[in-house]
Amino acid sequence: MKHVKRGNVISMCIVALLVNISISQYCLAVTTEEELKNWPLSCYTADELNKVREWEKTWVGKKINQDNIDQVKEFMTEQFYNMFKNPKDWGVDELWFTIVPYQQLPVTPGQVALTKKHAPTAKLDPNPRKCFWKEGIGPNEFLMGWEKGETAGFPFPFPKSGIEMAWNLESNTRGDTKSLDRVGVVVNPRTRVERRAVQPWLFDYFTGRCDAPPTPNKPKNPKGIRRAMYLFIEEPLDVQGTRYMELRYLDVKKSDDVWVWFPLFRRIRRMGFSYKADTIDGSDLAPDDEVGWNGHVNLKTWKIIGRKELLVSRHQDLDQLTKQTGQAVWNGYMMERTNSYVLEAKWKDKNAVYSRELLYMDPEDWKCLQKVAWDRQGRIWRQFFFNTMVVKSKQGIVQPHNYELYSSDLQRRHGGPSLDKIVEIGQTIHNRFWSIQNLQKLGY
């Protein structure tokens, strides 16, 4: 009997040792300095790019509409194809775009330097963590050093799992500090009615800053703010003067703070965390949908489905975009082939607004290119485009900028073509701006 017990103890020790070794190996840095020597890389290998260039000899400069879209259908999501194949459903007789040559997106000098500094030591925590959402954070989900603001750049430039890719998405600080004017319309193509929206926005990252001083973190941040966001509604007139401020924290035990100034009551109201899943001012866009996912990485599970070549707008000339009244999608997109990753996201909360999301990720700067979302019943619901142009910051740094966050409801069939017009990138915003007192002052 003693021998049996001793054997059981030895077996348990061996199993524990093997589990410990496997966890340790999983959490070792996945990126080596040797790999980073030639980074950043194109989304295509040399051989793949040669094939793309041959294809471009036939297609670059061609106008694509419902008559010839079937010939390039393989480079689209089903939802994008259906939209441009059936333009009358979206308020116009013809939807069209043109094909342009592929160009590699620039990665900023700060992103390159900080990625090469931090990626070789980036790893996921082998231990579970408690957080403000009941589903918790499992082993090998949380980026170590994140809660202290010790990370910057892309932690996993060569991701091997969905969670690593999601951390790359979260780590893109998009110019560090940015102000823009979002001007667009929500269109019902059946009635051709448009509801105009004008919203100045501010974004300010407190940690992981790459190019705009101070880097990598803003000083005097006792609350541990990760990112701050502010918007003011100028139009439509019925909600003019509404102001929204959102603070996300590094500490996963601390829920996001969302404050809204309502001019009608001249009062500030603190909104619940679930408010971020509600759409903004009658559009199809919720705060959570910004940039593909605007929330804590570990609220969802992430899985790489594979690769998908897409035609996407990454080097757009805004003067080429046109639309008629009642048209729910822009004409004139300049589309180039891009070899994206397909990243599946599912909320851990089974009662969340989406049952499933597919994010098409750009492997050159780890931004979301397009997103498709399913409702709680598993039906296709919403489609998003995160279209890009190349701009310069206040510091003269060339970088990608999402000039449009397009959202559409595929069930009720309406959409929101818009433009995010840059005011400034890389400006200085004092920490005092991000306070309830200042939000109230701005309201008065």
Predicted regions and their residues:
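C-terminal soluble interaction/assembly domains
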Residues: 346-422
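Solvent-exposed N-terminal domain segments of exported/luminal and surface proteins
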Residues: 30-255
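Low-complexity, Gly/Ser/Thr/Pro-rich intrinsically disordered linker/tail segments
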Residues: 332, 411-443
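Flexible, processing/modification-adjacent segments and terminal tails
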Residues: 147-181, 185, 193-196, 250-255, ...
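N-terminal secretory signal peptides that target proteins for export/translocation
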Residues: 1-9
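Sec/Tat signal peptide C-region and signal peptidase I cleavage site
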Residues: 23-29
